[in-house]
């Protein structure tokens, strides 16, 4: 599943989204995808639960196998639709010179991708989102164990943060990037600043804080997270990453950016086991530090974006 899903499907769809819109539309393209992806995940989860209940008839293993078979069938149908309905030489919003036969990716292109500063900036932005997302997952038990929120309310808000904020944050980030800032790098800077502020506030909240205030803050953390997640791959044109190596760039950024998933949850769990309630403060401080790193990466992205824009302007004037 990791090979077929993460390796093959994910990279192809990321490049496909980039090809769907022009450079000026990248924020909205990825933001809308993020929202639709969240909606589809939520919808399919409920559908699969229904299939498990109907097909299993009390047998959990049979129900689970039936749900897996349905998911596999949907994946197969989706792949066939793309194969037969998508034009072979589709270019959509990408520039024709970037997708010609002469520009097929080579080993040299793979190596070149590692040398592009924007690829590493994108990887750091992904790293920061993944880490902040892990920190946010501990806000639910923190709100109940330390701040005194009802467990039912905290769990409900956690679900809304995961799905509802995804539906709102992705398109909002894309709109801000394309229409307000005219720059994904600047929108990423806003998102990282929002993560810093919202997580930082939890560090100073006293026990017994108003439930209404906690609900608002938990949702704001979710919005801040998805302002970052919805657009971090759409930063590629600003970073001077050519369309024909887009999938390679995403692969590098994903490989590096998702490394925190390998250790942060274990580390956070150890802190809570060792320090109790004080362990949550360590987690929040780690989140604040990560957000600072994200701000630095976003500032570098803004600088790099301006440098790339000046270079393109000079080339056009020549």
Indicate where each model-derived feature is located.
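Helix-to-loop junctions at the C-terminal end of transmembrane segments
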Residues: 169-183, 272-273
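A late C-terminal transmembrane helix in Major Facilitator Superfamily
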Residues: 238-276
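Flexible cytoplasmic inter-helical loops of multi-pass small-molecule transporters
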Residues: 84-108, 310-316
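C-terminal transmembrane helical hairpin of 12-TM major facilitator-type secondary transporters
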Residues: 183-232
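C-terminal membrane-cytosol helix-exit motif in multi-pass small-molecule transporters
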Residues: 72-95, 297-302
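Cytoplasmic helix-loop-helix junction between adjacent transmembrane helices
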Residues: 1-36
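Glycine-rich segments within core transmembrane alpha-helices of 12-TM secondary carriers
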Residues: 27-52, 254-265
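Extracytoplasmic gate region of multi-pass secondary transporters
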Residues: 45, 116-173, 229, 264-265
């Amino acid at each position: 599943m990791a090979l077929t899903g993460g390796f093959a499907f994910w990279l192809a769809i990321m490049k496909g989204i980039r090809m769907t819109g022009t450079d000026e539309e990248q924020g909205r393209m990825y933001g809308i995808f993020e929202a639709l992806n969240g909606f589809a995940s939520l919808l399919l989860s409920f559908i699969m639960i229904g299939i498990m209940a109907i097909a299993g008839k009390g047998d959990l293993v049979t129900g689970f196998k039936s749900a897996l078979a349905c998911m596999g069938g949907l994946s197969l149908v989706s792949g066939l639709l793309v194969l037969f309905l998508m034009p072979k030489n589709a270019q959509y919003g990408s520039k024709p010179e970037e997708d010609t036969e002469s520009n097929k990716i080579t080993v040299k292109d793979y190596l070149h991708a590692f040398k592009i500063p924007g690829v590493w900036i994108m990887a750091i932005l992904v790293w920061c989102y993944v880490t902040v997302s892990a920190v946010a997952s501990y806000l639910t038990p923190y709100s109940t164990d330390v701040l005194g929120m009802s467990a039912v309310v905290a769990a409900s808000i956690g679900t809304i943060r995961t799905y509802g904020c995804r539906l709102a944050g992705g398109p909002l980030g894309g709109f801000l990037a394309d229409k307000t800032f005219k720059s994904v790098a600047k929108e990423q800077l806003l998102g990282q600043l929002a993560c810093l502020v919202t997580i930082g506030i939890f560090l100073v909240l006293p026990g017994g804080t108003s439930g209404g205030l906690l609900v608002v803050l938990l949702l704001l953390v979710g919005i801040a997270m998805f302002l970052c997640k919805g657009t971090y791959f759409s930063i590629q044109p600003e970073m001077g990453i050519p369309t024909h190596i887009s999938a390679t760039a995403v692969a590098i950024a994903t490989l590096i950016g998702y490394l925190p998933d390998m250790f942060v949850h274990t580390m956070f769990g150890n802190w809570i086991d060792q320090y109790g309630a004080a362990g949550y403060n360590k987690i929040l401080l780690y989140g604040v530090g990560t957000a600072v790193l994200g701000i630095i990466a976003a500032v570098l992205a803004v600088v790099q974006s301006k440098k790339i824009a000046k270079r393109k302007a000079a080339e056009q004037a020549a």
